[in-house]
Design a protein with these regions (language model features):
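Active-site oxyanion/phosphate-handling segment shared across diverse enzymes
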Residues: 141-164
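N-terminal nucleotide-binding beta1-loop-alpha1 segment
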Residues: 1-17
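Short aromatic/basic micro-patch
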Residues: 15, 103, 140
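Conserved N-terminal catalytic core of the sugar/cofactor nucleotidyltransferase
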Residues: 31-92
Length: 164
């Protein structure tokens, strides 16, 4: 079973604008650290899904210069951005990670993939009951589950988040 990854990222943030391109050390950005961590994971394709806003053009340029695949979509309807990205790349099973979490643990990623592959679930996460620190959350779901959520989400709160 192939598990692909969509990483949601944006430059706009009320608490810390531009945090995904924050220079953490020697020119290495937050998003770069995240991709370094994911290199040793069992994830197949990794796509960064960013808004179409002009403020995100700098992130788009950085990703292109770093040879990182990128998808641009709705700024406010993050569920639609994810759904359209999954369709564009024909993903069947998707891990969701946020781009401002450079300390994601590839062992946790691989353990989640293994658990998802060996279960008969449509959704798996390590964050329903908090046992992991903030910034290490992962979610895996089927493209079918994502499509159902996309079709039936009506409230603004259901569209601005990919999962509850």
């Amino acid at each position: 079973m192939e598990i692909d990854c969509i990483i949601q990222a944006r430059m706009g943030s009320e608490r810390l604008p531009g945090k995904v391109l924050l220079d953490l050390t020697n020119g290495k950005k937050t998003i770069d650290f995240l991709f370094e961590q994911l290199e040793s994971s069992e994830l197949k394709k990794k796509i960064v899904a960013i808004p179409e806003n002009s403020e995100d053009d700098i992130l788009f340029e950085h990703l292109n210069n770093s040879k990182i695949l990128c998808f641009r979509g709705s700024s406010l309807d993050v569920l639609d951005r994810f759904y359209c990205c999954s369709k564009e790349f024909s993903f069947k099973h998707i891990m969701r990670i946020t781009g401002d979490n450079p300390l994601i643990d590839p062992d946790v990623v691989n353990e989640a993939i293994n658990e998802y592959e060996n279960s008969n679930c449509d959704y798996l996460t390590n964050s329903i009951r908090r046992t992991f620190p903030n910034g290490t959350e992962v979610e895996i779901f089927s493209s079918n589950s994502l499509e159902v959520a996309w079709k039936f989400a009506r409230k603004k709160s259901e569209r601005e988040h990919v999962t509850p």
